[in-house]
């Protein structure tokens, strides 16, 4: 995956050769490959970027055979606009948005005409509140956004440790604006908004990576959307900040 990006940035064929060597290796797609299941596609995650590598190979080579590996997989996954795509019970929104990101990149670059944008739009709509729970899984975005993100530093939680039993929500707590929580554990939107349920309410950088990537892809396609003035920090030019009871320490340096 890194080799693919480096080739696009430098046009150094060394990286292209490296990418193709791995993608076309005889053991590609077999379990147990160096412990990482190389080439066994899944939504992009911290543990597996094989799908992203395949998309980059298709973009770089333009070969129909390279793209077919991607579209064959996506066709099996991105096939229902009415059912929430749930790859795993832990952090399902992370996998869902990561799949959207991959599908949108394929829709943009694949020469076969494969188009998954409508599926992605439907999935994103579910994540942002169009679901049986009427829950928006992006913290701080709307009045129906989840509140109990599993995040000690900024959760709206009244205690510094969720295991102490102090589970009351504090309106004076910090809000982790824009964070994508794990989400439902199945396609039926089984979900509980509690900080103690890390499968449903955990947050992480790789969760938001898919969210931002998918949102960018959808905007690139549909060119619609606006900044909601009710979201904290969007009414003016000041960034979203969290505050403490103590004044922050400001360090200055002499200008050079």
Predicted regions and their residues:
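Solenoid-like repeat scaffolds
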Residues: 24-29, 36-43
């Amino acid at each position: 995956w890194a080799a693919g990006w480096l080739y696009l940035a430098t046009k150094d064929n060394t990286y292209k050769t490296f990418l193709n060597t791995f993608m076309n290796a005889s053991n590609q797609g077999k379990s147990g490959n160096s412990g990482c299941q190389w080439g066994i596609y899944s939504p992009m995650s911290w543990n597996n970027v094989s799908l992203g590598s395949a998309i980059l190979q298709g973009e770089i080579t333009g070969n129909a055979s390279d793209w077919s590996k991607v579209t064959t997989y996506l066709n099996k996954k991105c096939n229902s606009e009415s059912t929430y795509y749930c790859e795993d019970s832990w952090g399902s929104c992370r996998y869902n948005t990561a799949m959207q990101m991959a599908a949108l990149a394929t829709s943009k670059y694949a020469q076969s005409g494969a188009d998954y944008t409508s599926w992605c739009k439907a999935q994103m709509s579910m994540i942002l509140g169009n679901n049986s729970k009427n829950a928006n899984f992006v913290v701080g975005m709307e009045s129906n956004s989840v509140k109990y993100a599993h995040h000690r530093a900024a959760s709206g939680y009244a205690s510094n440790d969720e295991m102490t039993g102090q589970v009351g929500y504090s309106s004076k707590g910090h809000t982790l604006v824009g964070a994508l929580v794990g989400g439902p554990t199945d396609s039926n939107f089984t979900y509980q908004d509690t900080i103690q349920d890390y499968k449903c309410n955990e947050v992480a950088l790789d969760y938001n990576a898919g969210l931002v990537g998918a949102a960018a892809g959808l905007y690139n396609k549909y060119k619609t959307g606006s900044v909601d003035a009710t979201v904290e920090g969007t009414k003016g030019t000041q960034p979203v900040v969290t505050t403490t009871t103590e004044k922050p320490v400001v360090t200055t340096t002499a200008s050079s």
